[in-house]
Each structure stands twice: as C-alpha cells, then as structure tokens.
A protein has these predicted regions:
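Metal-dependent phosphohydrolase cores
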Residues: 2-43, 49-276
Length: 276
C-alpha cells in the first residue's frame, strides 16, 4: 500500500513522523507523508515561510515572496492554523500552557531558573514575577527590543510595576551598578565583543530608569538574571503556580482570546507559522 492509500486511522496524530525538510534558506515544507495519513489519503504539502523579521539582512531576505509559486503545485498550501508538529493549546490558554507548549527548553529554563533564584533570595513576589516573565518575548515571539515587547504582552495581566521592570531590564542590563552588586555580564563580552557600546537611546533609557521609584525592581531582575543558565538544573513551572495565581490576572477566555490590545501577540505564539 502506498502512503497515498493509507487509511486516516492508521496512526494516532501525535505519533506521526515529521516529514519536514528545508526549502530555500530558512523556510520549510511538510511533505505529504504525515498529511496523507491524517487527511484520509488526500495528502498535502504545507509550506512554512519565515517572516520578514527573521530574514531581513540575510541572504533569505525576500524569500517569502519567492515561495509564492509553491502554491501552484498540486496539493500545496501555505501553513495556516495549527502546525501538527507543535503541541495544540487548550481552549482557554493559561500562562503555564505557554511555558509548557511553546517556550523552548532553553528559554523556559532560563526564565524558571531566574525566578527560582529570586525566590530563594526571599524577594518580593513582584520581583519574582518580573524574573519569570522578563524574557518572555524572546521565548516565544521576538528577540530585538524584547523588554518592550514583553512588557506590552503582559501589561493587561500584571501589576504596572512588574511590566515596567520587564521593560527597563532590557536597558539596565548593559550598565553596571556596583553599589547593589550588579556587574556587566561576562557573557555579553563573549556575545557582543569587548568593544560593544549600547546605542545612545538605550543609555538614556537606563539613566532615566535609575531615577525611577521602581528602579530596584527592574535592577533585581538583572541581578537575578541567569546569563549562562545551568542546563542540568530542573525547575518546574508548577513551583510558581501560587505566585502566578496571586500576581497574574488570567483572562476567563484565555490568553489570546480575551479581546485585549495584546491578544494578537499571544495568538501569534499559538500559531507562529501562519503565512498571514
């Protein structure tokens, strides 16, 4: 029996092998192997095209539009909706669901270890929450200006001080404050080079943050940040369920579906591969 003739009930969905290969520089196609079984033998090539933010300044710039002819191939579509290679979300997603279902092992471990360190230091729950969420944008959305993106994502659901701390840690991390025990991270010397100088707008933002009444909340995020996290350490999101319950306003309809001004950001993490 050929793959095209295989019955749709032959293999449970989550046990299907991933038939994914790269096309172009940073784009991917799911070949019919999986979908032929899943869709009752109809078969469908599904193209995943990288967004502009992932390709600008690289040889793959413009690749998304170069892939448009792929849709003319019989049985070929661009990815929209659930990607079978990603875990599906429940009807009303919670913050914990994003940690478990979207944030990669390294990103989730980084956030959880930072929050654990703040917890072990006996810090205020607002600081612990800010540590838990400080790189949430990197974990599931975007790296550039991640403090600002992250602060916007969580603003409707946390205390204003927590969102402010997440936003300002992005600038403060570049500038030492030895009076409170924060030195410039050695990891940054390796990441960016010993001659890296933050742009002037970042310097101004850090200077303004140091004058703010919530400065130490954000500074404590940088102090408890794990710049080189321990891959052997195990910290579970469940350790923070009570703190999250007291400090994160979970929307009744679920993150991404509460009609908030930032719901689209959470939906983007649910369906990160949508063509549009």
């Amino acid at each position: 029996m050929s793959v095209d003739e295989a019955p749709s009930t032959a293999v449970p969905d989550r046990e299907l092998p991933a038939a994914v290969r790269r096309i172009g520089q940073v784009s991917w196609v799911r070949e019919p192997l999986d979908d032929a079984v899943r869709n009752g033998g109809r078969g469908r090539r599904t193209v995943i095209a990288a967004p502009a933010v992932a390709t600008l300044g690289t040889p793959a710039d413009g690749e998304k539009f170069a892939l448009l002819p792929e849709a003319r191939e019989p049985g070929t579509v661009f990815m929209m909706g659930d990607n079978p290679d990603l875990p599906r979300f429940p009807l009303r997603p919670s913050l914990g669901d994003f940690f478990r279902l979207r944030f990669g092992g390294g990103s989730a471990a980084h956030l959880l270890q930072s929050a654990k360190l703040a917890l072990e230091h006996g810090l205020d729950e607002k600081v612990i929450m800010a540590c838990l969420l400080h790189d949430i944008a990197i974990a599931g959305l975007i790296s550039s200006h991640h403090g600002h993106w992250g602060a916007q994502m969580i603003a409707p659901y946390v205390d204003e001080e927590v969102a402010w701390a997440v936003e300002k840690h992005e600038a403060l991390r570049y500038f030492a404050d030895e009076s409170v025990g924060y030195s410039y991270p050695e990891a940054y010397i390796a990441y960016f080079g010993p001659d890296y100088e933050p742009p002037e707008y970042i310097r101004r933002e850090a200077e303004d943050a140091r004058k703010h009444r919530w400065y130490m909340t954000s500074r404590l995020v940088t102090i408890n940040d794990i710049y080189s996290f321990d891959p052997a350490a195990t910290v579970e999101f469940g350790e923070f369920e009570d703190i999250v319950g007291r400090n994160f306003r979970q929307p009744a309809d679920g993150l991404g579906f509460d009609d908030s001004p930032v719901a689209h950001m959470w939906r983007t993490m649910i369906w990160p591969n949508n063509f549009l």
